[in-house]
Swiss-Prot record:
This is DNA repair protein RecO. The lineage of its organism: Bacteria, Bacillati, Actinomycetota, Actinomycetes, Mycobacteriales. One of its GO terms (cellular component) is bacterial nucleoid. One of its GO terms (biological process) is DNA recombination. The keyword DNA repair applies. It comes from Mycolicibacterium paratuberculosis (strain ATCC BAA-968 / K-10) (Mycobacterium paratuberculosis). Involved in DNA repair and RecF pathway recombination. InterPro entries: ARFGAP/RecO (IPR037278), DNA_rep/recomb_RecO_N (IPR022572), NA-bd_OB-fold (IPR012340), RecO (IPR003717), RecO_C (IPR042242). Belongs to the RecO family.
């Protein structure tokens, strides 16, 4: 089969044999790709350093039966240097990469929107000018939107009645009107769902003026909504929470949201 080229974000890697690695890539045109990078653990490897997690690369690959083979790599953006130098940035970016892999869908299914979103998010994390918790929640909301899992924020998740609505129920799919509100719904403080909408839509001027208490509440809702659809928590999110010193009450609140009953139709 012919060689192919694609832009990719390196999501993760692990050792193979004495000198090789298997890398997991989120490519623009071929989606999730797993490939062998031969000899990259040797000190004289031509492109070993370019295949570290967080790297944005242009790669040439040879299709294989189970795993492709990396034959050439050109660095586009070296985000890793700025990301790994700060633990908070590192844990935030790790959560983004884990989310990207979980939401990419079937291997080799084109994922241009998720690829572009992930590149932009890593660039913003590496830049360090915006709040990491806002960046992460914005990424999670938009990534879920690409996957078709975005929570309803401006209308009722059940009957589509225009909002704003005060109640939120993860199992129902987001905000719910008084008539559709299931048992176990939470009622976020005023402004919380507005912040979620701002993060989803990219209204950073509004988002950056919100109090930390609202941001903490949004983090709980976003993580709960993502966990509901993935059916398990991201391994990296607890590390991010410790970095931001999320209050114990927020963690308890999140557990309550996850425990909402499923009889919401």
């Amino acid at each position: 089969m012919r060689l192919y080229r694609d832009r990719a974000v390196v999501l993760r890697q692990h050792k193979l044999g004495e000198a090789d690695r298997i890398v997991t890539l989120l490519t623009r045109d071929h989606g999730l790709v797993r490939a062998v990078a031969k000899g990259v653990r040797r000190t004289r490897s031509k492109f070993g350093a370019r295949l570290e997690p967080f790297a944005h690369i242009d790669a040439q690959l040879h299709p294989g039966r189970n795993l492709d083979i990396v034959t050439q790599v050109v660095s586009i953006d070296a985000f890793a240097t700025d990301i790994v130098s700060d633990y908070g940035r590192y844990t935030c970016a790790c959560a983004m990469l884990e989310t990207a892999e979980r939401l990419a869908g079937e291997e080799r299914a084109p994922a241009p929107a998720l690829h572009g979103l992930t590149v932009s998010a890593l660039r913003a994390v590496a830049d360090g000018r915006r709040s990491r918790d806002l960046l992460l929640d914005a990424y999670l909301l938009r990534a879920m939107g690409i996957a078709g899992w975005a929570p309803a924020l401006t209308e009722c998740a059940r009957c589509a009645t225009p909002g704003p609505h005060r109640a939120f129920h993860v199992g129902a799919g987001g905000s719910v009107c008084p008539h559709c509100r299931p048992a176990g719904s939470t009622t976020p403080p005023p402004g919380v769902l507005d912040l979620m909408s701002a993060l989803h839509d990219g209204d950073w001027e509004f988002a950056e003026q919100t109090p930390q208490s609202h941001r903490n509440y949004v983090s709980g809702l976003v993580a709960a909504h993502l966990q509901w659809h993935l059916e398990r928590q991201l391994k990296t999110l607890p590390l991010v929470e410790r970095t931001y010193h999320i209050d114990r009450t927020i963690a308890d609140q999140r557990a309550t949201l996850i425990g909402q009953d499923m009889d919401c139709g």
